[in-house]
Amino acid sequence: MAKIFLSAGEASGEHYGALLMAEISRLAPQTEFFGLGGTRMAAAGLRRVVRAEDVAVMGITEVILHMPHVYREYRKLKASLRTERPDLAILIDFPDVNLSLAAELRRLQIPVVYFVSPQLWAWKKWRVRGVKRNVSRMLVIFPFEEAFYRAHGVAADFVGHPLADLDPPTVTREAFASENGLDASKFWVGLLPGSRARELHANLPPMLETARLLGPEYEYLLPVAPTLKDPQVQALAVQAKGAGVRVVHDARAVLQHARASVVASGTATVEAALIGNPFLVVYRVSRITYAVAQRVVRVAHIGMVNLIAGRRIVPELVQHDFTASKVVERLRPLLENEQARATMQSDLRTVGAALRVNSEGAIQHAARIALQLIPAEQSPRLQSALVSSWPVE
């Protein structure tokens, strides 16, 4: 029986971690999992040494305030590795913790798979040296990342993006309208400011002003996860309702049925591209964070869709350029000009195709590669089963 250590400290990574555990369990029944994760991974069978919610802090101030506690939890993880000696470690995103764990795992001579690369290609390229030294295999979800890591001598494989494996939302426009009290005769505009309180505070006000400027001929939809209980988030939702914006609970359905959307930089931009919803990317952070980013970030675009395409196929409004008037200026063609819409949708289909490797799926692909790194002497029957079940291209 194989024993695998996993570490995922953020919501998206934890979601991928739970899916990965399910696929590994299918391929290698009775595999034992332990490590760092959230409630989804616990439900999938992870024996939690550290809870993700106890170490997930954001922003420079929060990191400084919580440093002693985070360090204590990190020491727990290191101690568990020395005691349990897993056959394999799978680290998922969360670079502030996982890159340090990778160094400890190398010292213990435990194979390390890193799934979902930290964005070292955008900044902190110097940290690639540590990845080369400490990570056995980097499994990336964006196509350009494979070439970046291989150029730096890192064994890397593009496995596809997990979101590309999802089926389109099944809810019809009529059903979604009925469920949420929407006017189905109007075009809908999606407003996706991000899911964290900090992102909503930065991005929602200009989005609400955008709705005011565009006027009542459109219906404006703000998806907010029903599980978000943060009082600040709830207050912002109330503010949105007061501005005539409808608060709903299904972001993917919004992207499926909106005429066009305004989307904060992040995972939602990839979802919009895969669904084929015309959109523009917005991004706003604190002045200090932006000043630092200007000095260290070395990429031509902030939108992942544009990075994948290698050119700007989706408009970007960053920091001071992110104003309601400029959003309206960029959004109107996507609402009113059929040629502009068709051109963007064609470009988005090309990006979507680039996020898929084969029919197997990203999670399945990642699980098979990861299990191959378990030394054969540890589980010879597992290795034999993997070889016989590997898909023929």
Which ranges hold each PLM region?
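Nucleotide-activated sugar donor-binding and catalytic core shared by glycosyltransferases
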Residues: 1-393
